[in-house]
């Protein structure tokens, strides 16, 4: 009898030990899960804090870039002014640059007066690497895209060509609203292949003529139909002693004729050429970069001026990596 009770007691003790062991395992699992939850929550908190910090830095960089725009847009602030680049405590800074929107060829203006000005585009495309006949064909296609009629220019492309490609609403028969539209024109891919940076040569926002005080030698050469060496010499004189464009020692031409004389344009030809160039464009392009910590934000603004009053006609923003 005593042996039976002893055996039963031993059995009960074994069951209790088993239950305690199971409970311990369960507790360890719970502790592990809680530890994992705490770790995950901590990680999420760090991510959220980092995200908040980045958002704050982005916002600060945007404010700094906007400050640069506001200063550069003032009519009394000129290129090279020290106010255009400023640094602050903590490493924050902004840097703004002013340029003329007329330092690029106005594509719509050239096509509007295509009878006299198409030579500018033909010569530019030829210099970029197209054959003469290819350059002529591309310009024909550009003219047909913007003119109001459906008559083909030489061997250009009008509605029937695009219709056969199931592009039923092409061409638009109006001036370009965006440089992206130029990519829709027949054979323009040849220009893109020859010069992937072709956009840097064109604008749709200027007053029309090329700003001879700020345009690069390549564009002055094709617009004025002069030798590239003459255009390079003009740019060298224009850039002053430091040979750096956009600084305070730059020489500005106040008269188009003086610039054309320097380029060696014959008097009988100067009247036609003078319609393509100017000494100042009413639109200014302002590029401002704001920096806060490791974050940089770039604002690009084009301002159209009438006297001392400016109107923003283009605005773009991007975060720089």
Identify the function of each model-found stretch.
Residues 2-8, 12-16, 20-321:
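Compositionally biased linear targeting/interaction segments
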């Amino acid at each position: 009898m005593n042996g039976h009770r002893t055996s039963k007691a031993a059995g009960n003790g074994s069951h209790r030990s088993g239950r305690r062991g199971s409970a311990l395992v369960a507790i360890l699992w719970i502790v592990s899960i809680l530890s994992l939850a705490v770790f995950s929550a901590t990680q999420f908190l760090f991510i959220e804090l980092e995200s908040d910090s980045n958002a704050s830095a982005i916002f600060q960089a945007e404010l700094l870039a906007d400050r640069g725009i506001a200063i550069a847009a003032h009519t009394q602030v000129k290129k090279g002014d020290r106010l255009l680049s400023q640094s602050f405590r903590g490493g924050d800074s902004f840097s703004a640059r002013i340029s003329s929107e007329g330092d690029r060829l106005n594509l719509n203006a050239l096509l509007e007066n295509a009878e006299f000005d198409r030579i500018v585009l033909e010569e530019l495309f030829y210099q970029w690497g197209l054959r003469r006949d290819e350059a002529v064909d591309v310009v024909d296609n550009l003219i047909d895209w913007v003119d109001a009629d459906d008559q083909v220019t030489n061997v250009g492309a009008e509605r029937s060509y695009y219709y056969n490609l199931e592009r039923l609403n092409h061409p638009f028969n109006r001036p370009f609203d965006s440089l992206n539209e130029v990519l829709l024109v027949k054979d323009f891919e040849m220009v893109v292949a020859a010069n992937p940076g072709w956009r840097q040569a064109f604008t749709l926002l200027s007053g029309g003529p090329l700003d001879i005080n700020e345009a690069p030698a390549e564009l002055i050469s094709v617009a004025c139909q002069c030798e590239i060496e003459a255009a390079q010499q003009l740019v060298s004189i224009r850039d002053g002693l430091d040979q750096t464009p956009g600084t305070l020692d730059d020489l500005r031409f106040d008269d188009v004729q003086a610039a054309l004389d320097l380029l060696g344009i014959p008097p009988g030809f100067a009247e036609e050429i003078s319609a393509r160039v100017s000494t100042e464009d009413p639109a200014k392009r302002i590029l401002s970069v704001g920096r806060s910590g490791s974050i940089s934000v770039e604002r690009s603004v084009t301002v159209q001026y009438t006297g001392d009053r400016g109107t923003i006609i283009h605005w773009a923003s991007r975060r720089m990596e």
